[in-house]
Amino acid sequence: MKKHIVISDPYPRRLFLIFSKKKLKELKSKYKLLKAPRLNKKDFYEKNIHKATFILGQPDLNKNLLSKATKLKCIINVESNFMDNIDYDYCFKKKIDVIATSPVFAKPVAEIALGMTLSILRDIHNAHFDFVKGKEKYGLESNLSSSLLT
């Protein structure tokens, strides 16, 4: 059976950040991946978009280019940002799904949000700058402007 073609263009992400080893192996076994180059992407898409069933990335896809994508079923936006670089109206009319990988980043985003919240509440970032300048404060004085999360 002929494998569906996936254009792999996750930049600035890399596939190992999006898929577990097991899922990446499964992806590669079930689909033929065409890796988009970092340079000359427009030429690459002009030559290959007609082959693709799926696109994994968020490349610039105008109506003209999308009109050549006769097999395209879905664009998986790996940034989950839905920038204005894809003709979404055309995709909607042609029933090309555009989906996001948001759950992939849920834990890292939650962790950084918690870290930033604690830094703000405990004034860690300013304490660090004071330490670097040799002006750090100790004891009660270092906690006067701090707050608790609870």
Residue ranges of predicted features:
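Phosphate-binding beta-alpha-beta segment of Rossmann-like dinucleotide-binding domains, i.e.
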Residues: 94-96, 101-150
